[in-house]
């Protein structure tokens, strides 16, 4: 849990501050109620009889994963639209949250899941590392105290997801908010 510093500002009507405070508390309550259950491996990873031409059984909808990359526990979610098949290569979109955000938050307010259903592409929501107590992406510059190799993490995810789903390697895209 983290604390939110509330700066007191004198208003003629203090109900504005109180309403915003309760909105923030409600939002934090909703986030804290979310489940942390996630898969630690893809369905086909432990298959002793792997066939290089055979993809995993399709798990439509949203699936959350947790992995360790370069000694750091990392999370990501994948959304597979109902229209996806292994028969034709699919585009993939990475959606990056901003500084202090989360993959769950950007998924909810970006609405890429419904867009992927309409346009038939896979969506990946990676979670940034949290070296200062706030999730963020190591983009150099002002985040230079972060030692996370986020470019390597994304490359690793592309490789990992390509093993399970038929991706068009020429149609891998990224979007994000702020630090994402």
Task: Name these PLM-found stretches.
Residues 1-2, 159, 176, 180:
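Short intrinsically disordered, low-complexity coil segments enriched in acidic
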Residues 1-18:
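N-terminal secretory signal peptides that target proteins for export/translocation
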Residues 16, 49, 101:
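Alpha-helical and His/Cys-centered functional microenvironments
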Residues 19-27:
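Sec-dependent signal peptide recognition
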Residues 33-92, 118, 151, 171, ...:
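A domain-start/cap signature at the N-terminus of enzymes
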Residues 69-77, 87-173:
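Serine-hydrolase catalytic machinery in alpha/beta-hydrolase-like enzymes
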């Amino acid at each position: 849990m983290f604390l939110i510093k509330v700066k007191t500002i004198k208003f003629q009507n203090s109900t504005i501050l109180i309403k915003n405070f309760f909105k923030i508390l409600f939002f934090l309550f909703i986030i804290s109620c979310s489940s942390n259950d996630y898969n630690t491996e893809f369905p086909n990873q432990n298959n002793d009889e792997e066939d290089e031409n055979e993809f995993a059984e399709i798990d439509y909808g949203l699936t959350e994963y947790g992995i360790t990359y370069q000694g750091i526990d990392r999370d990501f979610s994948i959304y597979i639209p109902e229209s996806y098949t292994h028969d034709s290569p699919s585009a993939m979109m990475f959606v990056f949250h901003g500084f202090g955000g989360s993959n769950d938050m950007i998924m909810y307010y970006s609405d890429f899941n419904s867009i992927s259903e309409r346009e038939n592409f896979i969506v990946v929501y990676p979670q940034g590392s949290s070296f200062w107590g706030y999730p963020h992406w190591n983009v150099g510059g002002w985040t230079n105290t972060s030692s996370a190799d986020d470019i390597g993490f994304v490359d690793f995810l592309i490789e990992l997801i390509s093993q399970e789903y038929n991706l068009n390697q020429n149609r891998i895209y990224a979007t994000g908010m702020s630090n994402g």
